[in-house]
Amino acid sequence: AELDALPQQTEAAPAAKLSTRTAPAVEKDDAFLRKLNAGEKVIAIELDSPRVADLGGYLDGARRLQAAGADLLTIADCPIAQARMDSSLVACRVHRELGMCALPHMTCRDRNLNATKALLLGLYAEGVREVLAITGDPIPTAERDEVKNVYQFNSRKLAQYIVSLAGEGREMPSPI
């Protein structure tokens, strides 16, 4: 008898109306490229990402550099092979919160092709249009038992790979 009894059906609450907000239009160019294309002087400053998870002080520093006239913030990718907050994630926050052009460095040392493509797609989705392709410093000898170099390609091949992805059209529009 217990098995024959069906659970009582309750009426579901009406579904919430989905937002009709549209996604922002993808920008075709940025201030950095506009200045370069116009032959204007561009001020680029490198500011390494923090070693801690708090970006507050970093963003304050970036804001001061922007107010002082910096057009572009370059962000190293684990300089001298020491772990820091990911340069691409920091670039996304700088772009989103400050509206400043950010150029994350992308090293060959830490990512294979699949991880590189995934990161480039994410950067593009966040509005970060440029990367600096670099080979990257090797992992210090003392740390090589625990941390491994990837180096699936060098910076020249990485740049060629990025150009080929940009040429795929719908998946990752140009410029990258």
Q: Which role fits each region the language model picked out?
A:
Residues 1, 43-47, 73-75, 102-106, ...:
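Hydrophobic faces of well-ordered beta-strands that scaffold small-molecule active sites
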Residues 1, 111-126:
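Catalytic cores of alpha/beta
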Residues 1-9, 127-140:
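Glycine-rich phosphate-binding active-site loops on the catalytic face of alpha/beta enzymes
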Residues 2-11, 81-105, 150-175:
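Alpha-helix-loop-beta-strand connector modules within alpha/beta enzyme cores
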Residues 4-56, 60, 170-175:
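N-terminal amphipathic alpha-helix/helix-capping segment at the start of soluble metabolic enzymes
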Residues 15-21, 25, 130-176:
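Conserved anion-binding
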Residues 52-65, 87, 113-120:
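Short, acidic/polar
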Residues 70-90, 139-150:
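Glycine-rich, proline-tolerant flexible connector loops at the mouths of alpha/beta enzymes
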